């Protein structure tokens, strides 16, 4: 068994989100027509934090929604107990808007694919972009993040553990089971 390696503290997360906010504004020529949609669970507080950063930079309030992808996952089996579905909550119209999906970790791409499926059931965005705090590689689907806080090459056995104040009472990103120091 490997050890835990510290990747980001609260200030590292804050800097990564500030940089992503600037990149979002630059790529989209401002914050007009943008909706941030957090993927449950940790994508939601990250989306809210990004919206705050964008407001601080641009002086424009960006709507934030929440997407529950439980029923869109391809790893649900028929034998499994009934999944707990929390429902999606996007108060703004997504048609003809730039929707930025926000998640904590991009790994195989299956969560992002499920989020795209869930999103198109809610409307037809002008464009969909993906922002992630950590990209750890090992894609199984042709999905790439538009905005990345930190690229962390990992082995498939390692686990990236993101803790956020709103859920876990602390902000940190750890790599568990690591045989190497990052």
From Swiss-Prot:
One example GO MF annotation: uracil phosphoribosyltransferase activity
Record keywords, A-Z: Glycosyltransferase, RNA-binding, Transcription, Transcription regulation, Transcription termination, Transferase
EC code(s) of this entry: 2.4.2.9
UniProt catalytic activity: UMP + diphosphate = 5-phospho-alpha-D-ribose 1-diphosphate + uracil
Superkingdom of the organism of origin: Bacteria
HAMAP family: PyrR
Name of the protein described by the UniProt record: Bifunctional protein PyrR
Natural source organism: Alkaliphilus metalliredigens (strain QYMF)
């Amino acid at each position: 068994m490997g050890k835990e390696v510290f990747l980001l503290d609260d200030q590292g997360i804050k800097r990564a989100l500030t940089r992503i906010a600037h990149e979002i504004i630059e790529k989209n020529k401002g914050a007009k027509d943008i909706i941030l949609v957090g993927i449950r669970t940790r994508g939601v507080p990250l989306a809210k934090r990004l919206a705050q950063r964008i407001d601080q930079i641009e002086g424009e309030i960006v709507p934030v929604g929440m997407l529950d992808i439980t029923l869109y996952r391809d790893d649900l089996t028929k034998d499994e107990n009934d999944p707990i579905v929390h429902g999606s909550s996007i108060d703004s119209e997504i048609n003809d808007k730039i929707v930025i999906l926000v998640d904590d970790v991009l790994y195989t791409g299956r969560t992002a694919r499920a989020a795209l499926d869930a999103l198109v059931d809610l409307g037809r965005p002008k464009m969909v972009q993906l922002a992630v705090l950590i990209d750890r590689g090992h894609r199984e689907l042709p999905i790439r993040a538009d905005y990345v806080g930190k690229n962390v090459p990992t082995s498939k056995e390692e686990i990236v553990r993101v803790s956020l104040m709103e859920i876990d009472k602390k902000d940190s990103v750890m790599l568990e089971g690591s045989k190497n120091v990052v």
